[in-house]
UniProtKB/Swiss-Prot annotation:
One of its GO terms (molecular function) is identical protein binding. Residues 67-381, 566-603, 694-916, 983-1035, 1127-1175 form a coiled coil. The gene is spd-5. It is found in: Cytoplasm, Cytoskeleton, Microtubule organizing center, Centrosome. Residues 1-10 have a biased composition (Polar residues). This is Spindle-defective protein 5. One of its GO terms (biological process) is centrosome cycle. Residues 1-45 are annotated as: Disordered. Plays a central role in centrosome maturation and mitotic spindle assembly during the first division of the zygote. Required for the centrosomal localization of air-1 and zyg-9. Probably not required in late embryogenesis and during larval development. Keywords: Cell cycle, Coiled coil, Cytoplasm, Cytoskeleton, Developmental protein.
Amino acid sequence: MEDNSVLNEDSNLEHVEGQPRRSMSQPVLNVEGDKRTSSTSATQQQVLSGAFSSADVRSIPIIQTWEENKALKTKITILRGELQMYQRRYSEAKEASQKRVKEVMDDYVDLKLGQENVQEKMEQYKLMEEDLLAMQSRIETSEDNFARQMKEFEAQKHAMEERIKELELSATDANNTTVGSFRGTLDDILKKNDPDFTLTSGYEERKINDLEAKLLSEIDKVAELEDHIQQLRQELDDQSARLADSENVRAQLEAATGQGILGAAGNAMVPNSTFMIGNGRESQTRDQLNYIDDLETKLADAKKENDKARQALVEYMNKCSKLEHEIRTMVKNSTFDSSSMLLGGQTSDELKIQIGKVNGELNVLRAENRELRIRCDQLTGGDGNLSISLGQSRLMAGIATNDVDSIGQGNETGGTSMRILPRESQLDDLEESKLPLMDTSSAVRNQQQFASMWEDFESVKDSLQNNHNDTLEGSFNSSMPPPGRDATQSFLSQKSFKNSPIVMQKPKSLHLHLKSHQSEGAGEQIQNNSFSTKTASPHVSQSHIPILHDMQQILDSSAMFLEGQHDVAVNVEQMQEKMSQIREALARLFERLKSSAALFEEILERMGSSDPNADKIKKMKLAFETSINDKLNVSAILEAAEKDLHNMSLNFSILEKSIVSQAAEASRRFTIAPDAEDVASSSLLNASYSPLFKFTSNSDIVEKLQNEVSELKNELEMARTRDMRSPLNGSSGRLSDVQINTNRMFEDLEVSEATLQKAKEENSTLKSQFAELEANLHQVNSKLGEVRCELNEALARVDGEQETRVKAENALEEARQLISSLKHEENELKKTITDMGMRLNEAKKSDEFLKSELSTALEEEKKSQNLADELSEELNGWRMRTKEAENKVEHASSEKSEMLERIVHLETEMEKLSTSEIAADYCSTKMTERKKEIELAKYREDFENAAIVGLERISKEISELTKKTLKAKIIPSNISSIQLVCDELCRRLSREREQQHEYAKVMRDVNEKIEKLQLEKDALEHELKMMSSNNENVPPVGTSVSGMPTKTSNQKCAQPHYTSPTRQLLHESTMAVDAIVQKLKKTHNMSGMGPELKETIGNVINESRVLRDFLHQKLILFKGIDMSNWKNETVDQLITDLGQLHQDNLMLEEQIKKYKKELKLTKSAIPTLGVEFQDRIKTEIGKIATDMGGAVKEIRKK
């Protein structure tokens, strides 16, 4: 059940308030008034019914005047409500216009920041573009150098090969004299020490010669490579110097175009042209030139837009300076006297306060303008120092440079001193700029409001100076002093009455003032701020003292009633705030219910329709949906309650204002006096409630009232005679009673005259008040027309601002698109840079590889030089020795050379044979491996085909056996399909095996039962034969007739009855279900079970118990059957019944299997459901509890 106590509390508010109000134009002003209206209706009914009391007859005109006064009061309240409504609309329109201006300014600042970001990104893009161009040029130069180096390396290689050949030719001796003698000497020397020496040293000598040639060639290569490296370094230095020069020239050209130095040259040049610096034909292509031209056009467009934005800023700041100049002149010229005139419910002090607020707002705007000027100066290229820029630039054309410090001090301290030096030429320039970048409607509206109020003040002042008073000798001064403190406080109800309650000061008792004035004497003058000092204050007459006392009581009671009414209004506002809190809390709760409903839907989908908890969850879902639908009704009720509370607060405010105005009107009546006492009483009343009005003579009013009283007397006499004619004609005996009544009526007439006079006075005052309110309403309507004009102008300005905003948004979108395109291009450039970096890395790797080769060559060169030195030393020694042995070796040199040639030829042939043998071995191994792979592939294909054929045959046989086609099909190239088919076949085979096992059990049971039945049949046949044999031995008829039936009955009782298989089946089924129940109980009591699983097992236990009870009841019913009347059927009939029962048993077994499968599914689904959703359900319940607790805390705060 939901707790609707809060809603019941809200619904009881109507009973507390009383009768419902029909409209805002009929406020319930007073509970006593309702009693009076009821009393007046009752008196009218008594008059109509014939109860002719003298008091009721004489009170009829008073009632009419009271009703007229009531109607006038209702009209006054209606007019005041309309006035408040129009004031509220004006304030709302003013706030809306100010909000729009702020939004436009925020958008403008965002645009400026976005423009700065775009400029920064454009500069970054330019730098990246320059870096990219430099990298491209470097990469191209490096690629060219690399290609040239490769060509040079190839040429050097070719030259080295030719030189090696030439050296080999030059090194070989045709006659072989030196080499032969050298070899002979070596052989001889070695042969002395080694007797087994053979002529094989010529091959080693050839190796030495080859090494020497290679050493010389490597030395030459190293020298050439060093020369080439020096040349490449020189070229790289020259190219880097050229690139640095070209980048400096380009930067200078761009700086010149940005500063406008090359304006004339740029106009003369062709647009979309590109500067060609250096050797452009080698480093740049046509695509790069077109790309650079597009970038230059975009840069030119961005510069144009930047110039437009700067011009717009300049025009905007010019307009701001012009407005400040006008406001300064207005403030300087607006010198007015502190008078006590009431202009639209505001005194001069209040006007000064409002002007101070306007000046404060202007100071804030001035500070913002100063910040904007600094920002503009920075955007235009300045340093942001206003001391220099404000005096030189045309943005602050109206402010002198000497006054900047005073401006800053005024802005810091909140002062209003800023000297503006207007110049005619600069004002003309300011009038030419017409770009509305900032909405100045608030300042203009304040200016217009101040001007209209100043005109009203001057007009009222002139009218008061021209108007001459008839009764008083003096007149008001041109500059009136301000009113008293109490008067201003009593009429501050029109200024924010709801937020700040009025402190009603209790006025002094009037009789004390009268006594003090009587004791002072006639020569003293009453010091009152509301009168001029020329008029003397007369004394108070004794006849007006009770009226003054009544007036004092009325004012005191109205003050007390105001305090209570204000407390009630505060309570209503608190209730309204609490209603909003209740509404927010209910919204949060309903949203939480939505999320919990979604959670229950997921649980229902997971559990399925077979679960017993599904129906409960569906019911909960329906309950959630109904509660969510009820949310709309509850929210509507809360909205209506909030509206009613808002209307109550408005009615309370209207009531307070009406009471204050009545108190003011009551005090006003006593300021109009014809004699000295009234003047004195008015001076006393003005001490506490004195609104300042114009004095007029009161004698004409008194005469009019006396005439009205005489007319009312005549009307009363005529009505009395007219009403009393009918009873006098009918009954002459009542004349004495009528005379008594007339005497009483004449006695009461004097009393009614005083009340009538008071009512007439009230009527006259109300009429005058109504006329004044109508005049005020006329003024308000005129002001409303002006306000509407201002609003239309503000709307037009707002439309213009919206258009500018739309333009700015379009510009922003274009800038964003430009930025996105630039980002895309930047990404492409980054990709190209990464590609170039990869190429550079490859080139660096190749350079490093070459350097490593050079280093290895240098190391080998050093080693070869060392070896050459050692060999040269050894050769010198050997040459000395060989000279001695040359003669001995000459004759054997020819033989040695031939043998050496043969050996070399044989070695080459051996090498060729070894390589051919290695290749043959490799090919043979490859061939064997390939043959094995082919055989394996064939074996696999045959095996797969045989397996697929076998699987197809097995699947066909199984489908024929089960009479069901397989869902999965075999795809030869897909292993997963074969696995699926195998799984399905296994499943089918396991199923068939289980069914065959079950069939075997059933057939075994059937065979056993058939055997039992056959045995029983044999027994029955034997018994029948025995009975037939006994019947043959029956005694004749007539003898022992009475004893025969006893024997037959005993025989029947002795025969065994037929045991029904249905009874046995019921017994076995009940026992089986009981065993299931016991097993489920054991599983239910096991430890480690989840709560949801326990619930499901409990439900299954209950259902199985119901099934057990049902079977047990059927068994009891079957036991109650009389077995004596059981029909002994034949064996064939029993077999057919057994077959039917067997079929029924199979159907029941299938159903039990289905139930078991569903139970397994629920068991498998419920634990996963609990594991997945347990935490979510806990968190959901916790969130609901926290939301409800938070809502209750918020509601109980106040």
